Each structure stands twice: as C-alpha cells, then as structure tokens.
Regions:
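N-terminal assembly/interaction segments in proteins that build large macromolecular machines
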Residues: 2-209
Length: 209
C-alpha cells in the first residue's frame, strides 16, 4: 500500500487501512490486486479524505508452505517471506533477513530465465569487444563473468549476510533443509530511484546487537 509522505505512513488511519488490506488479502489470496483494489475502493476513498493525500493498493505477494518465516527491516519499508521444507524458525528468519538485505532475484542459477541471461551476455560482449584478445579468451571471459552474475542474483549462491564466509546453500546443507519458495517486497519498488544499502544496515544492526 503506497502513500505519498512518511507523515501519512505513520498515521494510525493509514496503518489500520494497511492491516485491513492485509487481512482481506489473507482471506482472498486468489484475487488479483485489481480485484482487491476494487473491493476496498470505498475504504480507500474514505482514507484519502481523512489524510488528504492519495493512497494506492499497488502490489501483493504470497507464498505457500507449512513452514513460513518472515523478516521486516527496521524501517518498515522492506521485508521478505521464506518457505522451508522442514521447520526451523531460527534458520527461516535468518534467511528471510538475508533475502531482505541481499535482494536475490532467483533461487538458483538454473532458475534464471533465458531473457535475463541473454541481456547480461549482450552487456558482457559489449564490455570485451575492444579488448583485442583471441576469440577463445573472450568467450572464457564472458563465461566467467556470466557465471559470477548468475551467482550474485541467485539466493543459494549468495554469501550469507551474517557470515559471508559461507553461502546460503551451505547453511541449508548443514541443517539438512531446503527452500521451497521465497519472496521480497519493498515499498515503492519500481517507483523510487534512490537505492538503499540494506546489507550494510543489517550488518550494522548485527554489530550493535
């Protein structure tokens, strides 16, 4: 749910509306965001009149499973949900925090779609086209950089934010567990230009705890 200012975001009327939207989504998970917006339009209009600025029900994400864990960053603007195969609350919350901080796009390199791979290959090819190196060397350079890119955007291959010496995949193996599904949502995602370094913020929180 988007509003225009932090002032309204802290308003109790806005918070209550967000909770109402959340409850409605939980009860009507199969409905699209457009259907949910239509169903709650009168409540939205009433809120707009109270707070004096526009409010939009913009996006919803949901995942399934028997073992669900969540993490919401301290600023309340970004959070994640993780579904594990087996119950492990500490592990689930740690991975949800990692997803919030590191923003993986896929679970594993094998899950990356062909369009994303092709787009990155084109970028890499443009970077090395003027290197005057032999073709086989250029191909190896592109392959190496592409594999690095795929690892960086894949949750399982990312260094664990609480212990960068190991990966999410290794932690899961240590606990004999696996990720069924995950999702991450950020306020204003796709709207705001400013980027937040949540990984650094999480590290700072850990050091102060």
């Amino acid at each position: 749910v988007n509003c225009e200012t932090d002032f309204v975001a802290k308003d109790e009327n806005f918070k209550n509306f967000c909770q109402e939207v959340l409850n409605y989504c939980l009860e009507n998970d199969s409905k699209s965001i457009e259907e949910i917006s239509d169903d709650l339009e009168s409540e939205r209009q009433s809120l707009v009149q109270k707070v004096g600025e526009n409010v939009i029900i913009r996006k919803k994400e949901s995942i399934g499973g028997d073992n669900l864990y969540s993490y919401i960053h301290s600023n309340g603007k970004v959070g994640a949900l993780v579904s594990l195969k087996d119950d492990n609350e500490e592990l689930g919350k740690d991975i949800a925090m990692h997803v919030t901080a590191s923003n993986p796009k896929f679970l594993s390199p094998e899950d990356v779609d062909s369009e994303t791979i092709e787009k990155e290959k084109q970028i890499l090819e443009a970077q090395v086209e003027d290197t005057n190196k032999p073709e086989e060397i250029i191909e190896k350079m592109i392959e190496g950089r592409l594999n690095k890119f795929l690892s960086e955007i894949s949750l399982l291959k990312q260094p664990f934010v609480k212990d960068p010496s190991t990966s999410i995949e290794n932690i899961l193996n240590d606990h004999k567990n696996s990720i069924v599904e995950f999702t991450r949502i950020e306020v204003g995602e796709g709207i705001e230009v400013e980027q937040k370094d949540f990984a650094s913020e999480v590290q700072a929180q850990l050091q102060n705890s």
